[in-house]
Curated annotation (Swiss-Prot):
Phylogenetic lineage: Eukaryota, Viridiplantae, Streptophyta, Embryophyta, Tracheophyta
Full protein name: F-box protein At1g30200
Any Pfam family hit: F-box-like
Gene3D superfamilies, per the entry: 1.20.1280.50
Stretches assigned to the F-box domain: 24-72
Length: 379
């Protein structure tokens, strides 16, 4: 018995759909939308993962406009494993002697190394590293398998082949200032070719309380005056150390940013912060361009930008009650501008916007108190 096999007319009219596994839905998305998504991703490690997905992703990532680089680790100066200068992001601080001439030295040398941990991140070094050529995706991908161990790349190297960055944020793993538990110390500095301004907020202790207070109705029993004990019990000396330490940390960060700023002329804004929230250095487009045109003046003592002569304003409260019930002991706010600056040191809008909440509220409360003027020479 024989059978006659005939083709199904229905299958000819309505063929089987293409297998989903052989169709890339990302091909339907325009490049502009993918770049918008990559801008939201921002983190350079996650962008490294994206590069492995496809050739198209690989080719688009260098055109991302918003980039975040998180520095993974801090390696001390005597760490012999980091002897290669091409794989360092160094931050140097200088020594500080107190007014009494004691050898109260604040000195530290850090090497901040961007160190990818997982295997996929090693491809980012191939894509964005300084020695990368226009090799194909397959060649770059095979380089991952040939890599042995974990390579280390500085932020400068990682950012080398990003050509369209407009907003760049680099985050250090910790703040540079070693402070005791319970002490509050925060700073924010703006730089051009030199320091434009700096704000420092500190407190000797922070006491958390469950009782909510209305600071609008509170009255300063001391009329905003600094008590005599502030000068005799080391309070003033401590604030001077806070101020100089913060300025040194800020100027060291600024010094290290110069090669990145020169390399990426598309930058509109640059922020260098730390995971502890201790200090923030900011530069806008005008300040970035100023640094490119006017080379910075380096300190002879260490690898940092020279701090110019300064005018400072200080506000102090022995005890400050915040609206949420938190109590700050020895609350201090210092506003700093170069002596040659034409801008007013006590500009209210600048002072109130320097810190995020709740610290912005602290600054607003302190500037209502009596203002004390100080000066500092260049260092």
């Amino acid at each position: 018995m024989s059978y006659l096999l005939r083709s199904d007319p229905v299958s000819r009219i309505h063929p089987e759909p293409q297998s989903l596994t052989s169709f890339d839905h990302f091909d339907l998305l325009p490049d502009s939308l993918l770049l918008l998504i990559f801008d939201k991703v921002a983190d350079v490690k996650d962008l490294g993962r994206c590069c492995i997905v496809s050739r198209r992703f690989h080719s688009l990532v260098p055109f991302v406009e918003n980039v975040l680089v998180r520095v993974d680790c801090v390696i001390s100066d005597d760490d012999s494993s980091s002897s290669d200068e091409n794989h360092r992001f160094s931050l140097n601080t200088a020594s500080i002697s107190d007014a009494g001439g004691a050898g109260g030295s604040f000195s530290a040398l850090f090497r901040l190394v961007f160190a990818p941990i997982f295997k996929p991140f090693q491809m980012l070094g191939q894509i964005l590293g300084p020695k990368r050529s226009s090799s194909s995706f397959d060649a770059s991908f095979s380089a991952i398998n040939d890599e042995i161990g974990v390579t280390h790349h500085s932020p400068t190297q990682v950012l080398k082949n990003f050509g369209e960055i407009r907003f760049l944020k680099i985050e250090l793993p910790t703040g540079e200032l070693g402070i005791e538990d319970g002490i509050l110390l925060k700073w924010r500095a703006d730089f051009g070719s030199t320091l434009d301004n700096c704000m420092i907020l500190g407190a000797s202790s922070v006491i958390q309380s469950n009782s909510v207070k209305n600071h609008e109705n509170s009255v300063d029993e001391d009329n905003g005056n600094i008590p005599e004990s502030f000068y005799t019990n080391g309070g003033l000396k401590l604030r001077v150390v806070w101020t100089i330490s913060s300025l040194i940390a800020a100027s060291a960060r600024h010094y290290l940013l110069q090669p990145i700023i020169n390399e990426h002329k598309s930058l509109d804004r640059l922020v260098l912060s730390d995971a502890d929230g201790q200090g923030v250095l900011c530069m806008n487009r005008e300040q970035l361009e100023e640094l490119r045109v006017t080379p910075l003046s380096a300190s002879s003592a260490s690898k940092r930008t020279l701090v110019p002569a300064l005018n400072m304003r200080l506000w102090y409260a022995p005890e400050l009650d915040l609206p949420d019930g938190t109590v700050l002991k020895g609350a201090t706010l210092v506003a700093i501008r170069p002596s040659e600056s034409k801008k007013e040191v006590c500009d209210a809008s600048w002072l109130s916007d320097a810190f995020e909440e709740p610290f912005g509220t602290v600054a607003k409360m302190l500037i209502k108190r009596r203002t004390y003027c100080l000066e500092m020479n260049s260092f």
